[in-house]
A protein has these predicted regions:
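Catalytic alpha-helical scaffold of carbohydrate-active enzymes acting on polysaccharides/glycoconjugates
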Residues: 2-195, 220-243, 249-291
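A structural motif
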Residues: 189-207
């Protein structure tokens, strides 16, 4: 079965996209800020339990994520603020209650809030049903920030067959789950079109460090090679370069310098600009309107 939502087309056969604010490599910094529930099994682990038996509470693996929310996030905030860079956060709405200082710090920094469920749990397993969880999380973010989220990233990028239709019905303009191209695409839904915003499964600290378990430095190495390629390819069309970040991974003491080095590498390129998800969505909708 072919992709039922996004018709197939070679990227090279698509019409060129114009620069945005004079830039051809459009960087989207996406910080995944998650609420791992203390009284539930952890969504991911770094410490294997003795005898292979999971326990709840899972203190070491909960603490892994909790450290990121306490000590890691301030490092990311400082790295972005010191360079004047805009960012988006894919945001579990439960963070508002669990980590109120963190939520306020991101709001005060002007980050864009992308819906990411209530807790770090796949929406197809959510209690109360997918639509209810999507609605509740978006409403909670709107109440906290004073504005509706325009973007969505499903926890674990996991959807059901109905997710795009539900998202459009809740007023979402773009979703980051469909990583099919280096430029946005249009997703067919029962109620019109939804934008597939490029995300990244290659330059993503969760993939590199939590799943593939590479040594520190691998993420910067991949970014360097990607930037070299995009500096060539962006002559033909503007390109979106998303970078997926997690406070408990990229901003531990032995990796935060890697993030800083990556940011400096990007800012040194004349082709690179930094944008939020909404800025990218407005740019693409104007350049290539949905039919």
């Amino acid at each position: 079965m072919a992709n039922p939502r996004i018709p197939y087309v070679l990227s090279s056969a698509r019409a060129p996209l114009p620069p945005l604010d004079g830039k051809r490599i459009l960087v989207h910094l996406v910080v995944n800020v998650e609420n791992w529930q203390f009284d539930q099994p952890m969504p991911r682990t770094i410490v294997t339990p003795p005898h292979g038996r999971e326990t709840v509470p899972d203190v070491p693996n909960f603490s892994w994520a909790d450290y990121g929310m306490r000590a890691g996030l301030p490092r990311i905030l400082k790295a972005f603020a010191s360079r004047g860079l805009p960012a988006s956060t894919s945001f579990n709405a439960g963070v508002i209650d669990a980590y109120p200082q963190a939520a306020k710090a991101m709001r005060d920094a002007g980050w864009e809030f992308i819906g990411h469920g209530m807790h770090q749990k796949a929406i197809n397993h959510a209690e109360g049903g997918e639509e209810a969880v999507i609605a509740a999380s978006l409403d909670k973010i709107a109440g906290f920030t004073g504005r509706r989220s325009r973007g969505w990233l499903s926890p674990g990028l996991r959807e059901t067959v109905d997710t795009p239709d539900i998202l459009v019905g809740k007023g979402i303009d773009y979703v980051c789950d469909w990583v099919v191209d280096d430029r946005p695409s249009w997703i067919n839904t029962t109620s019109g079109y939804l934008m597939a915003m490029p995300y990244n499964l290659e330059i993503n600290d969760s993939i590199i460090y939590a799943i593939e378990r590479h040594a520190t430095g691998e993420m910067a190495r991949r970014l360097e090679f990607t930037l070299r390629r995009f500096e060539m390819e962006c002559r033909d069309s503007a390109i979106v370069l998303a970078i997926g970040l997690h406070p408990h991974l990229i901003s531990v003491p032995h990796r935060i310098h890697e993030l800083e080095r990556m940011l400096d590498l990007l800012t040194a390129s004349a082709d690179v600009g930094f944008f939020t998800g909404s800025q990218l969505a407005d740019w693409y909708a104007a350049a290539e309107p949905a039919n």
